[in-house]
């Protein structure tokens, strides 16, 4: 009721305030207090006794023009924001923002083509292919058309300033296949024909490779966020849908397919600059060691072990990532922290990282 329901703003806030003292040891406690301190000048600890006073103070500030979203971005010294965008997105808002001279921060898209790799989704995949056809202006009758449409959108994103891709995958895919098989699998997918697990994995393997080639040819950076086990509660998924807090850490075997994919791209001279974010901390040493195999001297730190992500985005997780990278690679070549939160107050997470 207090998250997705129709509870009032005050009821939501007061219940959160009641929860805060119970969060000692959880990063939410630090994040919340940092946000209150940096943006609202509140240094009291949020709890049941302070909730009403803090609520009134924050609402008063939010009602003033000085604490707008733009002000928060400027105050946080943000120079560039990358959004995660589906290949079918129009990017109209990016164009409007970048034409507005009053906005000092640059906002650029990032390519997030996850839905292009999900033939197992049946009707949803078919619907997405239709949307891709409309967005690209390419009539998609077969796999070659599908790739042509994606390449057109990739070029469109490039023209809009995109230099970064992001792939949310369960694991790395590197099955053996023949390209004619992929054409057949695609035809089955868009006709609504059942695909077995091997066909699905072969399709994902080829698409991950194709996207790697596209990124390398445009000198983009490719990112891989992998390992999440999603929608674990069937009950809540059927009631509320995806992305409602029922995702957790998976334990796929990843070393061999990761190596195989990178080796194929590297051997063809098509391995782009890469950042890898494992969700399972057991993979820290795996990733830290793996990236050393594919550094090629073209750019310092071409292969990156990304900062602690999701369940590792907290003090111990950050320390583990930093220590592993220091021991197995070069911390001096690390590209640093990122904030993948959807909140305009989340820039305090960079302070949290810097303190560590």
Which stretches of residues belong to each language-model region?
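Metal-cofactor-binding active-site regions of metalloenzymes
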Residues: 1-218, 270-272, 276-288, 292-356
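Catalytic core of soluble alpha/beta enzymes
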Residues: 173-187, 206, 224-286
